[in-house]
Regions:
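Short cytosolic juxtamembrane segments of multi-pass membrane proteins
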Residues: 378-395, 756-770
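C-terminal transmembrane helical bundles of large multi-pass transporters
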Residues: 490-491, 595-601, 609-715, 719-726, ...
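Short, membrane-interfacial amphipathic segments enriched in basic
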Residues: 1-4, 237, 395-411
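Juxtamembrane segments of multi-pass membrane proteins
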Residues: 50-66, 407-532, 536-540, 548-551, ...
Length: 770
């Protein structure tokens, strides 16, 4: 009996059942789809790193040393795998363009950091001048297999032929300036050569300046410190601080909040619409359920007779939610991977997000149906048999006067909203949530642009020159004078480790600044600049260690250990850097009176002279870093646009569903209006007035809601990447509100067309469900 009743109820619902299933599946499916996309991106990245053996620790030295002792040192430290490489900074010359380059001399059969060849062939011992190029650089300049290019290394120019293109786990998202967590795709020409070939071409036979290892327990801890001790280290990079890994972790950490936020927004409004729809269904069966109670059926049977059709709707909605999860997940994962230059995304079927989407859809449906059914089952059978009380639709006098502001059709539409406050409120909340979420994404993009522009605008340098080896301050100053720089500022940088009193530990890049830096200006959010015994931390490092101003820290470098106090916290895109006075930093790094980097203020000619100087390894410009940031944001805007389209699509579904449910409830009224002579224009005005009124109220509500949604998102971005603040601007909202109004008019036109197709006589006589 219950099964027959459920089947009959579903058939009677018709279009309403389809709309309820769509609403059930859309919200949870969209939220779970973003979770699935994050899972796919992480799985793709981790699978790539695992397959091509990304080392868990990399030591870059300031000068080449004999390779044999380095390998023996790694074995003594307990390394499971180890390889030495020769990595030289220089410039790639191709088609009149000069690009910062790293020549990587590596074993042909490398145990670590293997190459994933995407075109052509890999390295070969017999091809001494056959180079394998990083794919991003080759794509940027249109270089193909068989082309020729030149590398300028340590004053020598070497002619090479491109043997193949590849991606490396170490150089995934390679960038010329890794200080900033903004990838400049193609800005660094990574050229892979057989190690013996590069050693021979540069006169450094048997030498290496890079040691990559896999240590038990990862790349941090006592073994790593023992391996590093006494070496002239320029950079220490454990796997967790590898550039590509840090960037994707920051993105995944930032985007991971979208899933719960979208799930919360769509879940609330979806539950409202589901609850209202099923409440109408239960109320329409009041007499029928009362009869079951009167003839002796227990209340649990009455509740079951309602839950059974609801469960059928929920099961269909759960299946739709799973399908939406897969579709949204793959769409977002592909957009993200395209934006950051990842390899092709792999799609393992993650059960978690699918089960979450289906479970939420089914649970929301059953909960929405159980509450009105439970209330009805507690009624006295005689009271239930009397049917639903006829409510009065008469509005208070002041509301009647307020709504009588236009033609009768518009008045009818406005009063229709007020006569059904629950349905109208649910619609307004759902549309406001969809608009607010899309606007919040716009706010984040504009705020990020503003914050990064402000960060670079506050700096006085135009170019940064990394030196091939540390130079005395006087020689570094002479180098910039020869280049014709208007102003120059020498700095010293090197790897260090900070330990907090609470046990926190992190690797940093220690930078030494002049007493009054003119070119590198710190944007201090609290405290003061570097001073003896007082270190300035980036906001990211302070959060990672959980320290605040005045906290005591232990600073360890290859030259020793010292105690420092957190004297300032700076907002910076160079999240790995911490700052001390230059003299103190140079002593701690074992480089007293020397510089490793020179910041200059000058034009492109100055940069060209610096690039041509053999003492300079690499030159990067502030303008190129800013351009790269804008390009990245432009590409990520494509991902944001996908999320906005999804948000607006779900909002449009809610709007269309609400108008359709309202239309189904009021077919008799529309038929009566048509019988009284109302035509397309009058009925269309009534429906459009109702739809636009709801959308305009929702648009007004979406403004504070958008800021409210953007706030935790910006905080999450600050934790992972960079403190951007919030800069809400009118375009962020108008770009979403205007399409929402257009969608409202389209939905109203559809409802009007259906109203005009009604059979007037049959509709007026019919007994409608709900």
């Amino acid at each position: 009996m219950l099964a027959r009743k459920a089947y009959r109820d579903l058939r009677a619902m018709g279009l309403r059942a389809v709309l309820i299933v769509a609403v059930i599946g859309a919200g949870p499916g969209t939220a779970a789809g973003i979770s699935l996309a994050l899972h796919d991106v992480e799985h793709t990245r981790d699978a790539f790193y695992s397959r091509y053996r990304l080392a868990n620790l990399d030591l870059r030295l300031r000068r080449p040393l004999a390779a044999g002792p380095l390998l023996r040192r790694a074995q003594a430290a307990g390394a499971q795998r180890a390889e030495t490489r020769l990595i030289l900074d220089g410039a790639a010359l191709y088609g009149g363009a000069q690009t910062s380059a790293e020549a990587v001399g590596m074993p042909v059969a490398a145990p670590l950091n293997r190459l994933a060849v995407t075109a052509g062939r890999g390295l070969a011992r017999g091809a001494a001048r056959g180079v394998v190029l990083d794919t991003d650089y080759a794509d940027r300049f249109g270089i193909g297999v068989g082309d020729r290019l030149r590398l300028r290394l340590a004053g020598r120019t070497i002619a090479l032929r491109v043997r193949g293109l590849a991606r490396s786990p170490e150089y995934l998202l390679a960038t010329a300036n890794p200080d900033y967590l903004v990838p400049q795709r193609g800005s660094l020409a990574v050229a892979f050569l057989p190690r013996s070939s590069l050693q021979r071409l540069t006169g450094l036979r048997g030498r290496a300046d890079d040691l990559a290892v896999d240590l038990p327990g990862g790349g941090q801890g006592p073994r790593a410190r023992r391996l590093e001790a006494g070496l002239p280290t320029e950079r220490v990079t454990p796997r967790s601080r590898q550039y590509g890994l840090r960037l994707t972790e920051a993105d995944v950490h930032s985007f991971s909040i979208f899933a719960p936020v979208m799930g919360l927004v769509f879940g609330i409004v979806g539950l409202l619409l589901i609850a209202l729809s099923l409440r109408r269904l239960v109320s329409s069966q009041r007499r029928e359920l009362g009869a079951l109670l009167a003839i002796g059926y227990p209340p649990r049977t009455v509740v079951a007779s309602v839950l059974l059709p609801a469960a059928a709707l929920g099961a269909l909605g759960a299946a739709l939610a799973a399908a939406v999860t897969i579709g949204v997940g793959r769409l977002v994962a592909d957009e993200y991977s395209s934006a950051v230059g990842f390899p092709a995304v792999r799609y393992p079927l993650a059960v978690g997000p699918l089960a979450l989407a289906a479970g939420l859809a089914l649970a929301a449906t059953l909960l929405a149906a159980a509450l009105p059914a439970y209330r009805l089952a507690r009624l006295d059978p005689i009271e239930a048999l009397r049917g639903e009380r006829v409510g009065s639709f008469e509005l208070p006098g002041w509301l009647q006067r307020l709504t009588a502001v236009g033609p009768p059709a518009l008045t009818y539409g406005l009063r229709g909203l007020l006569r059904r406050p629950l349905l109208s409120a649910a619609t307004v909340v759902s549309i406001a949530g969809a608009i607010g979420l899309a606007a919040a994404l716009n706010i984040l993009v504009s705020s990020t642009n503003s914050a990064v522009d402000a960060e670079f605008a506050g700096q006085g340098w135009t170019h940064s020159a990394d030196l091939a080896r540390p130079l005395p301050d006087a020689r570094a100053a002479a180098l910039t004078r020869r280049a014709g720089a208007a102003r120059a500022e020498a700095t010293v940088k090197g790897p260090a480790e900070l330990n907090a009193a609470g046990g926190g530990r992190t690797g940093i890049q220690l930078a030494g600044l002049p007493r009054r830096p003119a070119l590198l200006r710190l944007d201090l959010t609290s405290g003061s600049g570097p001073a003896p015994g007082r270190i300035v931390l980036s906001a990211q490092t302070a959060r990672r260690l959980g320290v605040s101003l005045g906290d005591h820290l232990s600073l360890r470098t290859s030259a020793g250990r010292t105690a420092v106090t957190a004297g300032g916290i700076a907002r910076t895109l160079a999240g790995e850097q911490s700052y001390l006075p230059r003299r103190r930093a140079s002593r701690l790094l074992g480089l007293p009176g020397r510089a490793t980097t020179v910041l200059v203020a000058g034009d492109a000619r100055v940069a060209g002279r610096l690039r041509a100087d053999p003492a300079v390894a690499r030159v990067t410009s502030k303008a190129s870093a800013l351009t790269a940031e804008r390009e990245l944001l432009d590409e990520l805007t494509g991902l944001i646009s996908v999320l906005q389209a999804i948000s607006l699509g779900v909002g449009a579904l809610f709007l269309v569903s609400t108008l359709a449910l309202s239309y189904l409830d009021r077919r008799g009224e529309f038929a009566t209006l048509a019988a009284l002579g109302y035509g397309r224009r009058q009925i269309g005005a009534a429906v459009a007035g109702e739809a636009l009124s709801q959308t305009l109220v929702a648009a007004a509500l979406s403004i504070p809601l958008g800021v409210l949604i953007a706030s935790p998102l910006s905080q999450r971005i600050a934790e992972a990447w960079f403190e951007i603040g919030l800069h809400p601007e009118p375009p962020s909202f108008l770009l979403v509100i205007l399409p929402a109004l257009a969608l409202a008019l389209l939905a109203a036109a559809h409802a009007t067309r259906r109203a005009l197709q009604l059979n007037i006589a049959a509709t007026v006589r019919a007994r409608l469900i709900g």
